[in-house]
Swiss-Prot record:
Name of the encoding gene: recA
Entry's localization field: Cytoplasm
Annotated InterPro entries: AAA+_ATPase, DNA_recomb/repair_RecA, DNA_recomb/repair_RecA_CS, P-loop_NTPase, RecA-like_C, RecA-like_N, RecA_ATP-bd, RecA_C_sf
Gene3D superfamilies, alphabetized: P-loop containing nucleotide triphosphate hydrolases
Name under which the protein is recorded: Protein RecA
Pfam family for this entry, one: RecA
GO biological process, one term: DNA repair
GO MF term (any one): damaged DNA binding
Keywords: ATP-binding, Cytoplasm, DNA damage, DNA recombination, DNA repair, DNA-binding, Nucleotide-binding, SOS response
Length: 354
């Protein structure tokens, strides 16, 4: 017993010394860590927010979004920026590809007048800008588009054809070590867009890989694989893509879930279409033939008309969104149903299976 008391006193003294030297919060018991309640930002897609398990992308972490060309990578990140700006957050876009379209960004709801944008000359410059913005503590979301375009200075200044084996991977590895801690302290979300390459000579297994080495794979808390799986047509005209996102890595919730949604050209993610599909699936919206009803009231015939109804009635769309998020992100036990708010009760009165 005396030995245990001495150990506790020694531990308390050591903890006090560590906090004195490195600051309060430098060491703590895991259950006391307030950061366990992870703050998130919506991706702009309700289905993807649910698949991520926490309601969006986590603040203070590194996220990688990768996929083939024209699969919706930049569109998804612009939707994240729009969602963050609606919450009053400051966002920055590091445009290493020099391809950001401000007109398209504005159509997706991005406030381009308040979006910080940089078009760096080298990969080192881009990552230093990221680090400076992070250490300022004033920027909430940083997008880097893309890892493949982060060209090391030595490669830019060298001749075409010179060998620079592993140079980009070493640059990314050093940057990850430096950025990870600063992002956590500043509670800044850093999203890297990445491209896909094919490994030569692979006979079995997946020949696809991402650029920039392995460091980003290890340091990323969330990795999203985004693919175009079909075309959306209006008559003979293609107006968008059916998109599928797989959560291939997730440190804040269960991984390996997937989300399916539509990306419409010039509009972005079809959020109202998602609300209709999820509402029908979870018996919040009734479908009889081609007619849709909500709370006993017909709201339109055909999905396109219901989408227009939700656009012109944002309060109904917000109500549906809130109920779906409460039910699918924060499931409750049977004994807790008596404590639900009125919106949640609507769900349970109309749902027999959960």
């Amino acid at each position: 017993m005396i030995r245990d008391e001495n150990k506790q006193k020694a531990l308390a003294a050591a903890l006090a010394q560590i906090e004195k030297q490195f600051g309060k919060g430098s060491i703590m018991r895991l259950g006391e860590d307030r950061s366990m309640d992870v703050e998130t930002i919506s991706t702009g897609s309700l289905s993807l927010d649910i698949a991520l398990g926490a309601g969006g992308l986590p603040m203070g972490r590194i996220v990688e979004i990768y996929g083939p060309e024209s699969s919706g990578k930049t569109t998804l990140t612009l939707q994240v920026i729009a969602a963050a700006q609606r919450e009053g957050k400051v966002c920055a876009f590091i445009d290493a590809e020099h391809a950001l379209d401000p007109v398209y960004a504005k159509k997706l709801g991005v406030d381009i007048d308040n979006l910080l944008c940089s078009q760096p000359d080298t990969g080192e410059q881009a990552l230093e800008i990221c680090d400076s913005l992070t250490r300022s503590g004033a920027v909430d979301v940083i997008i880097v588009d893309s890892v493949a375009a982060l060209v090391p200075k030595a490669e830019i200044e060298g001749e075409i054809g010179d060998s620079h084996m592993g140079l980009a991977a070493r640059m990314m590895s050093q940057a990850m070590r430096k950025l990870a801690g600063n992002l956590k302290n500043a509670n800044t979300l850093l999203i890297f867009i990445n491209q896909i390459r094919m490994k030569i000579g692979v006979m079995f297994g997946n020949p696809e890989t991402t650029t920039g080495g392995n460091a980003l794979k290890f340091y990323a808390s969330v990795r999203l694989d985004i693919r175009r799986v079909g075309a959306i047509k209006e008559g003979e005209m293609v107006i968008g893509n059916d998109t599928r996102v797989k959560v291939v890595k997730n440190k804040i919730a269960a991984p390996f879930k997937q989300a399916d949604f539509q990306i419409l050209y010039g509009e972005g993610i079809n959020t109202h279409g998602e609300l209709i599909d999820l509402g029908v699936k979870h018996q919040l919206v009734e479908k009889a033939g081609s007619w849709y009803s909500y709370n006993g009231t017909k709201i339109g015939q055909g999905k396109s008309n219901v989408t227009e109804y939700l656009k012109t009635n944002p309060s109904i769309a917000a109500e549906l969104d809130k109920i779906l998020r409460n039910r699918l992100l924060n499931p409750v036990c049977e004994k807790d149903k008596t404590d639900l708010d009125p919106l949640d009760k609507i769900y349970h009165e109309n749902s027999t299976a959960f």
